[in-house]
Structures are given as structure tokens and as C-alpha cells.
């Protein structure tokens, strides 16, 4: 009996000590000495790439397209997206608030990544520091890109003659989740965008090729500069940026090439294509509204029944003349 009691006491003591250790240093927490490693820097970088995949899919495309009459609602839509289609969006609408929240949550993650990489820098080897310099450059680019995307939805169209008076958006540059930032002007917003692009170009120097570009390259920054210059009415610069990429990324000119691009992800047009695998499909929003179909066993074909289709006026813009 005495041996049994002693064994029980020993087990209870061991269990108590183990529980205490887990309370002090739980297995799911990151230990302070592990937070300043290359692995963690890669982790916060990867988290931002996941955010970007979400922002570049699903409703972030279909809702604005519905609102500006690029898409028409089909009979089988079940009124999905009807408020956008009928121009009945309000500031309290779920689509509007979720877009705002998603953009600024991504900004928070970007600024956290920059702050953490700065804190970890002195603990890294010289080779690791070079990689982190590139990662930080990516973060500066994504900050500029996300704010431009948000401005397209929440600001007036940029007018060079009025930008100093047009309302911009808060442009957070530090990881301060509770900060209350002023909107500023649209001119100031794009000054910040330009400053972040300059920082990105200092370290993101890999040129890129049309195959398997799942991380940011110099060419992707150039492509964004072309889009940005067009938006800012800098037409000569927009043309120059775009022309500098034509030779490396020629447009697909055949039906077979177009099919390979959409079915096999093989194309000469791809400047940057964020990686999505079967195991990471949950990190992107669905494009099912464009692709809904059902299998008809009697006829042996798929019945295509999209929620939306491109408007006739928009299709005419894309057809050869």
C-alpha cells in the first residue's frame, strides 16, 4: 500500500510540474529565442503572401465588376450580388465593411512583418540578412499595392488638378493596431505609394521570367508602375513601362495558348502568379460565381450556369476589330 501511495504522489508531482511548465511555456507559443530566427522571418513574409491571395480573388473582383456594369446577373444567381448590380451599396453594407477591414488587416500584417524583420536583423547571418532585405522590399511593394487597390474603391478617381484637395485614405506605416490616422489627401497617398515603391526597388532586383514566378520580381514592380502611371494620368510613362516588358512577356495569340494559360497555368503572359495548390485552395476566395456548372449524365456534358456573365458592351471592347 505504501508503494502504491508513493507512486501516486510521484505521478501527481510529475503531472503538476509538467502542467506548470506548459503554463509558463505552452507548446503552441513561440519562445522569445525562436522569434528572431530566419524561419520566423519567412513565416511573417509568407503570411502576407496569403493575405494577397485573398485580396486578389473572389468578391474583391466580382463586386466592383458588378457595380460598374462589367458583369450582368444571370437568372440562376439567386440575387447574389444584386445590391452591387443595382447600385444600392451603402457604407454599412457587408461587402463594403469587409473590403475595408481586409485591406487594413493586410496593412497591419505588412507593417508587423517589417517591424519583426528589423528586430530580428542583428541575430541573422550575413546571408540571411541579404534575404531579409529582399523580404522587406516585398513588404514595401505590397504596402503600396494594397493602398492603391483600396484607393480605387474608397476614393474619387485621381485628378492631377484636384488631387491636393481630394480625400485620400489613412496610410499606416507602423504596426500600431490602435492608431487613429487621418485620411489625408489623395496626392499625399500617392506620394507614400511612390516612396514605398522606391524602397522596394532597392532590394527586389530579380528580373523574372514568364514561368513559375510566385514571388515578387523587379518586372512585377515595373508592371505595377505601368498601371499606376496610367491611373495618375502619366500616359507617356505608362507606355514606357509597359513597352519595356513586351519582349519578355508576349501576349498569347492562339486559342491553344489561351487554353493552356487557363487550364495548365502555362503562359508567356504571367509576370507574377501567386502560388495556389490543392492543399492551399482555402487561402483564396472562390471564383465559382463565374464558373458554376453541373454534369448532365444523360447528355454527357457539363451544363454551364454562371452567376454572372460579361456585359455585351464590355465583351465588344475585347473583341478584335
Cite the ranges covered by each PLM segment:
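Sec-dependent bacterial lipoprotein signal peptides
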Residues: 1-18
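Membrane-proximal, proline-rich intrinsically disordered regions
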Residues: 20-67, 242, 306-308
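Hydrophobic-face positions in mid-chain alpha helices that act as interaction patches
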Residues: 43, 215, 233, 237-317
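Conserved, well-structured interaction surfaces
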Residues: 80-154, 184, 202-205
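Inward-facing hydrophobic residues that define packing positions of alpha-helical scaffold repeats
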Residues: 107-110, 190, 197, 242
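Short coil/linker segments at helix-helix boundaries
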Residues: 123, 127-132, 153-191
Amino acid at each position: 500500500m505504501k508503494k502504491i501511495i508513493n507512486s501516486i504522489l510521484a505521478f501527481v508531482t510529475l503531472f503538476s510540474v509538467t502542467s506548470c511548465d506548459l503554463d509558463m511555456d505552452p507548446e503552441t507559443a513561440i519562445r522569445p529565442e525562436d522569434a528572431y530566427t530566419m524561419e520566423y522571418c519567412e513565416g511573417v513574409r509568407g503570411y502576407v503572401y496569403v493575405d494577397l491571395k485573398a485580396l486578389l480573388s473572389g468578391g474583391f473582383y466580382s463586386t466592383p465588376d458588378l457595380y460598374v456594369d462589367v458583369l450582368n446577373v444571370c437568372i440562376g444567381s439567386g440575387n447574389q450580388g444584386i445590391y452591387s448590380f443595382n447600385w444600392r451599396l451603402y457604407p454599412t453594407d457587408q461587402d463594403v465593411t469587409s473590403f475595408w477591414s481586409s485591406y487594413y488587416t493586410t496593412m497591419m500584417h505588412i507593417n508587423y512583418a517589417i517591424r519583426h524583420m528589423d528586430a530580428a536583423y542583428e541575430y541573422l547571418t550575413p546571408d540571411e540578412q541579404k534575404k531579409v532585405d529582399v523580404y522587406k522590399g516585398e513588404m514595401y511593394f505590397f504596402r503600396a499595392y494594397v493602398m492603391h487597390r483600396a484607393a480605387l474603391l474608397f476614393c474619387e478617381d485621381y485628378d492631377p488638378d484636384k488631387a491636393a484637395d481630394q480625400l485620400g485614405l489613412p496610410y499606416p506605416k507602423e504596426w500600431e493596431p490602435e492608431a487613429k490616422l487621418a485620411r489625408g489627401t489623395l496626392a499625399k497617398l500617392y506620394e507614400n505609394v511612390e516612396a514605398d515603391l522606391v524602397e522596394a526597388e532597392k532590394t527586389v532586383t530579380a528580373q523574372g521570367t514568364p514561368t513559375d514566378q510566385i514571388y515578387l520580381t523587379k518586372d512585377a514592380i515595373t508592371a505595377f508602375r505601368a498601371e499606376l502611371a496610367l491611373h495618375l494620368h502619366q500616359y507617356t510613362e505608362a507606355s514606357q513601362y509597359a513597352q519595356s516588358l513586351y519582349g519578355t512577356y508576349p501576349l498569347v495569340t492562339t486559342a491553344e495558348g489561351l487554353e493552356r494559360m487557363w487550364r495548365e497555368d502555362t503562359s508567356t503572359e504571367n509576370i507574377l502568379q501567386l502560388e495556389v495548390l490543392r492543399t492551399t485552395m482555402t487561402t483564396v476566395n472562390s471564383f465559382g460565381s463565374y464558373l458554376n456548372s453541373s454534369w448532365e449524365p444523360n447528355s454527357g456534358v457539363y451544363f454551364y450556369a454562371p452567376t454572372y456573365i460579361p456585359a455585351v458592351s464590355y465583351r465588344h471592347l475585347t473583341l478584335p476589330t
